[in-house]
Amino acid sequence: MKVLILGAGGIGGYLGCRLGAVNCDTTFLVRENRVEELEKNGISLHSELGSAHIQPKIISESNDTGHFDFVVLSCKAYDLDSAIESVRPHLDKETVVIPFLNGVAHLDVLDTEFGHDRVAGGVAHLAVTQTKVGVIQHLNNIHKFTVGSRHEEQLHKLEQLSHYWSKANLGFFISNNIEQDMWDKFIFLSTLAGATCTMRSSIGTILETSYGESYIVRLLNECMDVARANSREPNEQQITNYRNQLTEKGSTYTASMLRDIQKNSKIEGEHIIGDMIKKGIRQKIKLPCMETAYTHLEAYELERIKKTST
């Protein structure tokens, strides 16, 4: 099974490094200016669950290397359009696209571009950062990847994929209801980003405040209301797990969006919290806490744009 991963940092770099360490046929598609450095130094992963180093197969957009059985996307939502054009030459009618993007809005975009029968679903529970090109730091002890079929023709290929990926040092699962899993994480991530970005603090610090836990729980309840109104009844066990993470005293957990804010970088506010609000508005759901969080993120983006344009 030939797998193409777009990018060698973050989720894609972590996944590819784990797969490469057990000799799965994995290729990274990267920018031209990163090819030489990655070919020279390889990809290193530092993790308490086991570190790894590989000399990866690398291609750039100028290479014509044929088609792949699977293409993995884990880009930021605002880079999705360019990501689609980068991987398009490497797809044929049998290729399955596995997106590990945040939220759910990207599914409609990918279905339009490649066809519903070629786009699977994916959920990654992973906190990593790229400290420099080719060096990935795992930030906790969670590395769970879940994929699932959204069309009956994908199921057999995903089962074949499981045979290879289950050998790697990561948690790999096949779901029989992947879109619900994506919605459950959408609820969690919207709550996590809404709380930690608005307060510019970790979950643990927010919980030390007078009304922090109340605010987090209200965010969570608003997101669950949106899911139910869109015929996506949250999975009770999964939401319990998420609620426990969101109310864990002393937790250092933050959303990656907050780390982007701290670096004065572009953020996925519209794709995650903005999309949750849009889906709520269509169903006439009131979302005062989410609206506050989104206003904060929009204000950040406006200030960032003003600073970069002067």
Residue spans for each PLM region:
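Internal alpha-helical scaffold of NAD(P)-dependent oxidoreductase catalytic cores
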Residues: 89-90, 113-118, 133-185, 190-236
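NAD(P)+-binding Rossmann beta1-loop-alpha1 motif at the extreme N-terminus of oxidoreductases
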Residues: 1-51
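Rossmann-like NAD(P)(H) cofactor-binding subdomain of soluble oxidoreductases
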Residues: 52-135
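Short, well-ordered alpha-helices that flank and scaffold nucleotide-derived cofactor binding pockets
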Residues: 17, 21, 85-89, 112, ...
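Short alpha-helical
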Residues: 33, 78-79, 104-105, 153, ...
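NAD(P)-dependent Rossmann-like dehydrogenase/reductase catalytic/cofactor-binding core
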Residues: 217-310
